[in-house]
């Protein structure tokens, strides 16, 4: 987390699963007041369409001007994903916000299937001289 314009993040995590209070990818839906996985594709772990949430009610992140959150995913942070996020916060003054995208721009993207997963793995291996773990 980069708080108020930091060049080096003051909060660093260990990856997606840990951020959402689990490990080794959720295999089944789970919900609690502060975090959960209401939708998971059990056969493919995080791949496919997975919905997760985490509320910072008991551990808020305080900021004054800006907040940038990044998250690590995949071995050595090398996995490409299409992620959508939402953030809620409290502020003392109201300000105008940008217009939301129209309905066509907000429609769901197609699910990733096993063929797509295979294609992504093969493309990644090619960038690593066909060594599954890189050089």
Where in the sequence are the language-model features?
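Beta-strand-centric surfaces of beta-sandwich/beta-rich domains
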Residues: 1-134
